[in-house]
């Protein structure tokens, strides 16, 4: 595994497990404590904390967590899977003996049984930073799940959500007004038809505040994508 080419910190989080077979997180309490401490530390270094998220399988665990916490939308039944047979929700809910919404008020159990390490750590970092810095969650469905977890745990502080125009349109079409749904301060970044992911909206928002237009950000992203795919200097067309 290659180390990131930027400052980073390790939380020691083990990989999540298959929620169809058992609890997805073996020590969610330790993950929460690590994330909370990290959030508090980072909040002391500036007046704003922007969080992105990237976790293999995160779209599935986010759907499972949101369904368990009572959120309703067709998109939550649209699991990205090529397998035939029962859906991830049908498997996990059968194991737990629950129906949609049965874990309302038991957010930590929902995250422990159905979530993933990044989901818990993102929520914990947000909670740890509350009161010390403005927190902006950057992403789509996974950050919506982190926000839902925080609200279920009783966090009433201000939570900001940055997302791209494309992702905001998709989420609003599925859930309605996101601000009303979870009391979020929503900031939408215009990156055309690019869906959010890995903190793209937050990074673009910070870059725009530093004088870089969205078009320039997109062009650079497509060029880098082309270089990665071809191993040679790419172009916007080559990176599509």
Predicted regions and their residues:
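N-terminal loops that bind phosphate or other acidic moieties
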Residues: 1-52, 56-240
